[in-house]
């Protein structure tokens, strides 16, 4: 399958290579850099002020930015490129980039047109514009023309975008489809079905075939029924449990903004074609209730985790679509609190937009979090969140009063709450003291075989991911955060990425790891989440002496002030940094050669400079490291009690076990 995907990307980058490299228009005007809720509703949404109308306003705000590139009805949705690694490149991929811009901004437009068919932005009637652009796809004389898939054609990015287009045709059928002539409908059906009926990839991509086929089957066209049913069976076979699908091979947000969005929407819209599959999609959706919402922090904000993170708040759409469920015990007020908070997390961040368009990054532009399959218009996949507007105004998702779910009363201070999911080996940990959530997840991909360079990267290879501390990229000088780095035979600092899950018992999350370039360098890893951080109990074995490093999370700068180092009078061995909003502490319970406070530049997603605590040690053959990695919210200093949750550490003479006695007299043993 990887060879197939590689071929697709090469085709994307080469597509349109005979064209003159397209010029990108400049915006007609600048929109507000952040979104302001026009009419906050604190009665139903006391925490965010965002109700259903507020969601409509936010969608219009984002779509208005895209429409500043549209001066007349012929102008494509084609936006300024960011980062050389993305496409289009040198005359290539322009047609596909325009198609992405068209189909993905339509995820904003279609729900809005469903509400208001006469919507006008930048002096352009939105419905007229998208219908015109839809017909341009069928016109051989148009620069946006998409050829029907040839007899021997394979899956491509066009299939992805046509799958999205099929959903939008369903969403705003009265505006986008019904006004077309029969001849136009037939041409569109022929082109889209040439892809939908055709070959696919055994991942979330199969949904694109399903939606194209389903829409045109509903409209009475002859379709490849075998292809649709085959895709549905294979999609359901990727379900692992507890709300998670495996997207061949990773667990990430694709389980949510793809599988747990497409499945329920298909079930509600076209499930009558195969009722048994529809029922299974809905059952799988219900499973996420007890796990996925716990990934968001106390304020309902999302974690920076996995690939395609520029899709950002698209991650909340499955929480909204729980409105399709009939279970009265679902806390819809909490679901909307999360969805609205995550939406505002970005649209109210002044770094989100550049030239009126969302950046390729987490908040602002951040190349390490961007993949080579993206173009600038790819960011509008975030607009999937607005499919929440498919739910009518009287749906409980919209009418329930916002609340913080378990963060209000169930979660207690000075406690830690683990949600281990045995079907996937994912561990979600909630920390009431700091109000944050942490994820430990899958990564086992070599750089050598990771030709797209993302499944082996920082997007997946960290020891953990925390909502309060977005991940720092690895530095050229061996700076590393929330991971170990080992100096390999080439003298390079190589981070861990080949993890094998072992167990989760007695609050201890166990993994083994080996170094890609030397499988004889082995780590036995144990994470013990605590109320104010994590206790690491790790063993490393090396065939020849070498150096290792361990980095904590990082702190961004705040208010233009640098991250500062602090000292504790009561616990002088603690190394502490603070940015005024949070503090981090590293307390070494076994010896390291060196602990440094560093200020890396250009590798943090929030600010140019950040603060990092990093340990370093020379390993002769085998050693055990026991390390407290702590955090605290606010500007108050760590107390002695917070810095000393461990009373004693006893390492067996053979280094095969470590016994930890905590300050509260509980005892845990890690066996290697």
Model-assigned labels for residue ranges:
Residues 137, 141-148, 298-304, 311-449:
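Carbohydrate-active enzyme catalytic cores, enriched for enzymes
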Residues 88-93, 147-152, 613:
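Short alpha-helical segments and helix-capping/turn motifs at coil-helix boundaries
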Residues 98-99, 106-116, 123-323:
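Aromatic-lined, polymer-binding surfaces characteristic
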Residues 24-100, 128-133:
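Low-complexity, Ser/Thr/Pro/Gly-enriched N-terminal "stalk/linker" regions
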Residues 464, 478-672:
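Extended repeat-based interaction scaffolds and adjacent low-complexity, acidic/S/T/P-biased segments
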Residues 80-90, 363-366, 406-411, 519:
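Short linear interaction motifs
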Residues 1-28:
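Bacterial Sec-dependent N-terminal signal peptides
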Residues 373-392, 396-558, 562:
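Catalytic and substrate-binding regions of extracellular carbohydrate-active enzymes
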């Amino acid at each position: 399958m990887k060879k197939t995907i590689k071929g697709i990307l090469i085709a994307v980058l080469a597509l349109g290579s005979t064209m003159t490299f397209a010029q990108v228009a400049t915006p007609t005007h600048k929109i507000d850099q952040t979104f302001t809720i026009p009419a906050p509703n604190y009665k139903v949404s006391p925490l965010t002020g965002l109700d259903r109308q507020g969601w409509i306003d936010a969608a219009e705000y984002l779509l208005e930015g895209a429409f500043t590139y549209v001066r007349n009805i012929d102008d494509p949705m084609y936006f300024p490129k960011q980062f050389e690694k993305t496409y289009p490149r040198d005359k290539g991929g322009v047609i596909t980039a325009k198609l992405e811009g068209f189909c993905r901004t339509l995820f904003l437009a279609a729900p809005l047109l469903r509400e208001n068919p006469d919507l006008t932005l930048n002096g352009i009637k939105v419905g007229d514009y998208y219908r015109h652009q839809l017909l341009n796809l069928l016109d051989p004389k148009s620069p946006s023309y998409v050829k029907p898939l040839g007899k021997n054609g394979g899956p491509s990015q066009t299939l992805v975008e046509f799958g999205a287009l099929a959903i939008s045709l369903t969403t705003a059928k009265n505006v986008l489809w019904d006004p077309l002539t029969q001849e136009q409908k037939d041409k569109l059906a022929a082109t889209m079905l040439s892809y939908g009926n055709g070959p696919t990839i055994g991942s979330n991509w199969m949904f694109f075939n399903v939606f194209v086929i389903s829409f045109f089957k509903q409209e009475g066209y002859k379709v490849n029924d075998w292809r649709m049913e085959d895709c549905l069976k294979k999609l359901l076979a990727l379900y692992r449990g507890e709300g998670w699908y495996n997207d061949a091979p990773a667990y990430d947000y694709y389980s949510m903004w793809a599988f747990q969005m497409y499945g329920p929407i298909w079930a509600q819209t076209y499930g009558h074609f195969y009722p048994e599959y529809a029922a299974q999609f809905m059952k799988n959706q219900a499973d996420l209730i007890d796990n996925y919402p716990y990934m968001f922090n106390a304020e309902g904000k999302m974690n920076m985790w996995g690939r395609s993170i520029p899709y950002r708040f698209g991650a909340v759409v499955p929480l909204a679509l729980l409105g399709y469920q009939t279970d009265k015990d679902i806390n819809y007020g909490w679901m909307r609190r999360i969805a609205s908070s995550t939406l505002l997390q970005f649209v109210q961040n002044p770094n989100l937009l550049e030239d009126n368009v969302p950046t390729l990054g987490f908040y602002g532009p951040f190349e390490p979090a961007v993949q080579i399959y993206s173009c600038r218009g790819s960011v509008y996949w975030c607009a999937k969140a607005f499919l929440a507007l498919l739910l009518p105004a009287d749906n409980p998702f919209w009418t329930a009063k916002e609340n913080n779910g378990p963060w209000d009363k169930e979660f207690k201070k000075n406690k830690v709450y683990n949600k281990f999911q045995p079907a996937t080996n994912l561990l979600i940990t909630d920390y009431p003291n700091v109000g944050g959530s942490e994820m430990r997840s899958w990564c086992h991909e070599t750089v050598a075989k990771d030709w797209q360079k993302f499944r082996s990267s920082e997007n997946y290879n960290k020891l953990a991911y925390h909502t309060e501390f977005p991940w720092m990229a690895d530095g050229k000088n061996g700076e590393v955060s929330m991971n170990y780095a080992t100096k390999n035979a080439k003298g390079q600092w190589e981070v861990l990425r080949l993890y094998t899950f072992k167990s989760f018992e007695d609050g201890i999350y166990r993994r083994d790891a080996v170094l890609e370039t030397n499988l004889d360098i082995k780590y036995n890893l144990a994470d013990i989440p605590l109320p104010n951080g994590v206790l690491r109990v790790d063993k490393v074995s090396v065939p020849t002496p070498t150096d290792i490093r361990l980095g904590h999370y990082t702190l961004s700068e705040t208010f233009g002030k640098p991250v500062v180092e602090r000292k504790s009078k009561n616990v002088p061995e603690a190394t502490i940094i603070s940015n005024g909003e949070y503090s981090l502490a590293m307390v070494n319970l076994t010896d390291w050669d060196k602990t440094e406070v560093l200020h890396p530049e250009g590798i943090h997603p929030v600010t140019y400079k950040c603060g990092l605590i990093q340990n370093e040690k020379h390993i002769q053959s085998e050693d055990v490291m026991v390390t407290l990695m702590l955090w605290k919210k606010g500007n108050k200093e760590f107390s002695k009690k917070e810095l000393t949750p461990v009373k004693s550490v006893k390492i067996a003479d053979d280094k095969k076990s470590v016994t930890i006695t905590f300050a509260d007299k509980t005892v845990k043993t890690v066996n290697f």
